[in-house]
Regions:
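Bacterial Sec-dependent N-terminal signal peptides
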Residues: 1-24
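A low-complexity, Ser/Thr/Gly/Pro-enriched, surface-exposed linker/loop concept
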Residues: 25, 29, 48-93, 133
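Non-cytosolic beta-sheet module surface loops
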Residues: 38-40, 51, 63, 306-308, ...
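Extracellular and analogous surface-interaction loops
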Residues: 51, 204, 293-296, 301-314, ...
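Solvent-exposed beta-strand/loop surfaces of large extracellular or lumenal domains
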Residues: 69-85, 328-349
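Catalytic and substrate-binding clefts that recognize carbohydrates or anionic sugar/phosphate headgroups
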Residues: 88-241, 255, 314-318, 323, ...
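Extended carbohydrate-recognition surfaces in non-catalytic/accessory domains of CAZymes
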Residues: 231-310, 399-426
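Aromatic-lined carbohydrate-binding/catalytic grooves of carbohydrate-active enzymes
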Residues: 333-338, 342-344, 423-485
Length: 485
């Protein structure tokens, strides 16, 4: 029988900030810190658990010798007095609350969450459940203020948390992505803030738990790696079957044609002409389109064949402005989509491509503007088992930091989320009504006349939106209204 060491704890019984040293962990208030017995390459050296409440346990992990001091921008102050029980059984540190158990292996760092019926809620993979890689912010991403940024703030850690997930599990959340996806099981999503994209680092499971990770960095759900350029994932052939690249055909509005080889479709961004750092370090983006070619009114076709290294359902990401259609193996896999060039969009799709076969591909693009964007990349193939795991990756943080929230149902999980992030005020009823919005109104008179017309037609309106151009003509983005209009 394994030796068992137990310690019953109530926050009220902890004397000030005094720490309690046990065999494999240090206890201080509702924090328990473990120095791992086995330090693996790219793994954590320390793990810290915080009992936030009966249903919430915080998990921190660091690859450094100690945890950095930091203040959260997500979590409101927590003043829990939760009761919990701590036991050691062999290498396992077991924390039991009135609603759940967390088991941390002090040798490997693997953590598993159970309900009180001993049913697994969430379990890290046996190897590689927490991985770290050092990360330094590239100079070009800091920009003109690079001299003002302290050296220490340029360095952090990319981390990945990886968990097993049963086939019948579903995941919901991550924010608002216009991705036409609801259940994120087996899906990929990039988390960052954008005009039409609102990212929230929280996911809820139909198994009645949620994970909120405390990171403000670019993050990825699902596949932790960059999407690949087409020539990194497939053998490419032009429309005549010659290996090495696709055929790109550019026809301007006057019928003038340019034909050239394309080893990748990656015209996704523009470089600021005045940025010395960018122009020294980045030669990509739309500057690689044919020199002097006028996009407005043109038609562009990329075509040829791709040969896959393995049988798989390949997960693609399309970045586009203007009109776009994609055919693979003669099938329309992306029906026509359109997006204005000042606000491009991403669209994810997947399709089966067999190993070793030259599979036809055709990308049709009408740029619809003097400046426009087009990109098609693909994720490296992964097994279905890998796709079905719960995977979270964060590009740059001082440490790994997430909250496990358990509940009897999803409502209790959301209640835990609100406990951590604070109570959102209930909106007044008029906010839930009909919002009338157009690109812009240029004067108060404009707004009042339109509002009167709605009333005359007896069309109910609760809100009318003044979007942009409320400022003076030469004061773009100002928070001061133009007084005359």
């Amino acid at each position: 029988m394994k030796p068992t060491k137990s310690l019953f704890v109530t926050a009220a019984l902890i004397l000030g900030a005094m720490g309690v040293q046990a065999a494999g962990f240090v206890q201080k208030g509702n924090y328990l810190t473990v120095q791992l017995k086995q330090h693996q390459n790219y793994g954590p050296s320390q793990i810290r658990l915080q009992v936030v409440s009966d249903r919430i346990i915080r998990v921190q992990a660091t690859a450094e010798q100690s945890f950095r001091s930091k203040q959260s921008l997500i979590i409101v102050p927590q003043n829990s007095k939760a009761k919990y029980k701590v036991e050691e059984q062999g290498d396992d540190l077991i924390i039991t609350t009135a609603a759940m158990r967390a088991v941390l292996n002090e040798a490997t760092g693997q953590i598993t969450f159970y309900d009180l019926k001993d049913q697994v809620l969430l379990k890290e993979v046996a190897q590689g459940g927490k991985t770290f890689k050092p990360f330094t912010v590239p100079d070009r991403e800091i920009g003109v203020d690079i001299a003002k940024v302290p050296e220490a703030q340029k360095h952090g850690w990319s981390w990945r948390a990886l968990f097993d997930s049963p086939d019948n599990e579903a995941f919901y959340g991550l924010g608002q992505h216009q991705s036409e996806e609801l259940n994120m099981k087996g899906k990929n999503e990039d988390l960052f803030q954008y005009n039409t994209k609102v990212s929230v680092p929280f996911v809820i499971s139909n198994k009645n738990y949620g994970i909120l990770w405390d990171s403000y960095s670019y993050s990825r759900w699902g596949n932790p790696d960059d999407y690949l350029q087409l020539n990194r994932a497939f053998k490419l052939y032009d429309k005549d079957g010659k290996e090495g690249q696709l055929t790109g055909t550019y026809v301007d509005k006057n019928g003038q044609k340019i034909v050239r080889g394309e080893d990748s479709i990656y015209f996704e961004y523009a470089m600021p002409e005045t940025s010395e750092i960018c122009n020294q370090t980045d030669k990509g983006g739309i500057q690689n389109l044919p020199k002097g070619f006028a996009l407005n009114g043109s038609k562009v076709v990329y075509e040829g064949y791709v040969e896959a290294p393995t049988n798989s359902f390949y997960q693609f990401i399309l970045y586009y402005a203007g009109y776009m259609k994609i055919y693979i193996d003669g099938k329309l896999v992306v029906p026509e989509r359109w997006r204005t060039a000042w606000n491009p969009n991403s669209y994810k799709f997947e399709t089966a491509i067999p190993k070793g076969k030259k599979t036809p591909i055709r990308i049709e693009w009408q740029p619809d503007g003097d400046v426009s964007y087009c990109g098609l990349r693909v994720a490296a193939p992964r097994s279905e088992a890998e796709k079905n795991q719960l995977s979270i990756w964060s590009e740059m943080s001082p440490d790994m930091d997430y909250y496990f929230i358990a509940g009897k149902n999803m409502d209790e999980v959301i209640s835990g989320y609100r406990t951590l992030t604070g109570k959102a005020p209930v909106y007044p009823k008029w906010v839930l009504g009909f919002w009338q919005s157009r690109e812009r109104y240029q004067s108060s008179k404009d707004i009042e006349e339109n509002m009167k017309k709605f009333r005359d037609l007896k069309i109910p309106v609760d809100n009318i939106v003044q979007d942009w151009n409320y400022w003076k003509l030469d004061s773009w983005g100002s928070h001061e209204f133009e007084a005359v209009s």
